[in-house]
Amino acid sequence: MPQPTSSVTFSRREKARLRLASQGLTIRRWESAEDVARAFGVMQGQDLHSVRRSLSLRAKDHSDAENIVRGYPMRNTLFAASIKDIGWITELCAKGRKGDTELRAGVTKLIENPLSRAELKERAATALPDVPFWHVVRVAMESGHAVYSGADQLITPVDLPGLEETFNGDKVAATAELMTRYFRTHGPATLRDFAWWA
């Protein structure tokens, strides 16, 4: 029976080659940009141009790139993901803060249609003057109400499929799915690596 990856020892060179292959950098493993995003679950997305380059390195076709959105699904960090996945991953991994529940209703009212950051900042300054703007954006995205989308990266209200719609509310199944995607695209890796990443 094969041993789990965590108990196998690789040289640095072997590990590097295996990771390049699992990340789709030696051959193109996926047809489209959305296929890449779905395979990874989420990809670091702070720098929009870098994440777009990362997707284009791994896919043959980019016509479905509009299905890639950005939000805050985990680790208080901006990630890119498929519109089909960011909702359940956010619900599974985002950690709410005290006071966010009360703030959510006010933030939701601010974003009824796609807005630029400047437009949302202006609305938030009037409606929620005591709340830092970055917190408004994060609450909107961590609650699954909005994502950055489109060529202009507008803050866009969305109705995302969550854990209930995708996994019948089963967090164990959702965690197993996210873990499977992680190991297939980041391996060789350990359970500790996954726990840090998620």
What label would you give each PLM region?
Residues 59-66, 127-139:
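Short amphipathic alpha-helical interaction segments
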Residues 110-111, 120-127, 166-169, 181-182:
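Flexible, glycine/proline-enriched loop segments at strand-loop-helix junctions
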Residues 133-198:
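Loop-centered beta-sheet repeat module
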Residues 1-115, 122:
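Phosphate-backbone binding and catalysis cores of DNA-processing enzymes
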Residues 103, 116, 132, 174-175:
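Short amphipathic alpha-helical segments
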